[in-house]
Amino acid sequence: MTDTETETESASPERHTSPGRFLGRPLRRVLRRHFGWLPLYELRNKIRYGHTVPRVWLFESAEVRRLRATLPAGAAPLVTTVIPTYRRPESLPAAVQSVLAQTIDDLRVIVVDDGGGGLPELPDDPRLVTVSLAHNTAVLGVVRNVGIRLADSEFVAFLDDDNEWEPEHLATALAALRSEEPDQRGQRGRRLAGVYTALRRVLPDGRELDVLSVPFDRQLARNEGFLDANGFVARRSRALRFSRLRRDRGVLPREDWATLYRYSRRHPIRHVPVPTVRYLVNPDTYYTVWDSIES
């Protein structure tokens, strides 16, 4: 689900407004050097939109309680994939099928409909669960959080409804995730909390644009928006929750960067340089927006 496909996608009048736009160049350079632009954008978002979070958090929690009672009984899978969706019938079935076609079988797919009024016909597979929110939230983070909180697996993964995975995506990510992150001396270090694979970015006409493969560097992430949930696989934990801020079109950074950057502060993350995600690029996608911003 692209971040802009909500009922209020044109509501934001502040497309690409930089928090340093009205500051002098020397001050902007100092702020960027010490903090990075993306944390400053996110601080602005929290100040402007933080008052909306309590309401959507209450709705999220109520929906989790309501929907949990509808889930099928059975043993917990190894990994749950959360697919948020909103009125995307033309691409959702292919996204779901790409998860069901993974080389590992011990999985579950939870499709969370953001009050879109119904879902298209999807593959008949007992590993697929679909739920619908009581009404449209237009907050991608809330939709993903409902899926995370409904999961009972050891690991969770994420895929948008217009993207697809290669068959070995989960196997590749889980193999890396189950390894240990070595410390600076090459000794056994902390257990990895999450990994993200490379994205093969594809244009609407099917041509490959490029492969986005950036090793994790928290300092670099302060100024470059390379963190994306579609390649991210993590150990399920209470700490892993997506941002609940409402982000209409033009509000930056997006949920993926805000969530993974914050999560990486206390949880080791590593990049797996294998392109296992087929990521559709169009004029409204996350990366197209970021690539157009003047730094």
Segment roles from a protein language model:
Residues E14-R15, P19-S98:
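N-proximal low-complexity "stem/linker" segments adjacent to membrane-targeting elements
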Residues S91, R144, W165-T172, D205-R207:
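Acidic donor-diphosphate engagement hotspot in glycosyltransferases and nucleotidyltransferases
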Residues F216-S295:
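Conserved nucleotide-sugar donor-binding catalytic segment
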Residues D160-E164:
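The conserved acidic donor/metal-binding loop of glycosyltransferases
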